[in-house]
Amino acid sequence: DQKQALEQLLQKEARMDSRCAKAAVTLGLAECLRFGITSVSDLYYYPEATAEILAQSGMKGNLALSSYRFIDQNEDFDFDTDEQCQALVKAVDTWHGHDDGRIRIDCGIHSEYTSNFKLWEALCGYASEKGLGMQLHLAETQEEVDGCLDRTGLTPAELLSCHRFFRVPTTAAGCGCLSDADRAMLGKFKATAAVTPMTCAKQGN
């Protein structure tokens, strides 16, 4: 069950801190280098801690804070006071363009089903203003797609597109359950699908 798996994952991640993030990033980058990978896209937490390790490694990377918003979409939302959005702003001010552009900061959401349109639109506006890219997990499982279709009558890609999500350069991780129409639309917007083979293997996709 996707919801239960996500809840268990969030409980584990809630115990993390920047020290844990740095250790995990160091191991992850070492594994990348082992296979000759020198450029990464990272969508997770603690972007500043990740940027520190990336800077030391000499690798190139696009880093995004995996933002989420579970509260009622009717509740007030203010980009200028939201904790995650302000963490993003700080990371952009500190790290975006570091070392002649070797490190770039993107905006990001975890996924369609862990956020809502107020966050999407605020991040898209900020990304457009600052010339940033966008990252997200998209259509990783059929359960995710079916859930969105049941709620809205649209696929996750279609729903996000209604809110002009793909009008900024977008990197979508997963993409294993896109429809033909989704693929055509993402191609139209020149979105990039990022391959995540280990994640897909763990999920049985």
Protein language model regions, located:
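Short, basic, glycine/proline-bearing loop/turn elements
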Residues: 11-14, 33, 37, 109, ...
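A structural motif
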Residues: 37, 59, 131, 190-191
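Short, composition-biased local secondary-structure segments
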Residues: 1-7, 13-29, 148-161, 173-187
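Alpha-helical scaffold segments that flank or form the walls of functional sites
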Residues: 1-59, 84-98
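Metal-coordinating catalytic core of metallo-dependent amide/deamination hydrolases
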Residues: 51-176, 183
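Short beta->alpha connector loops
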Residues: 40-47, 113-114, 175-179, 199-201
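Active-site-adjacent C-terminal substructures of enzyme catalytic domains
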Residues: 165-205
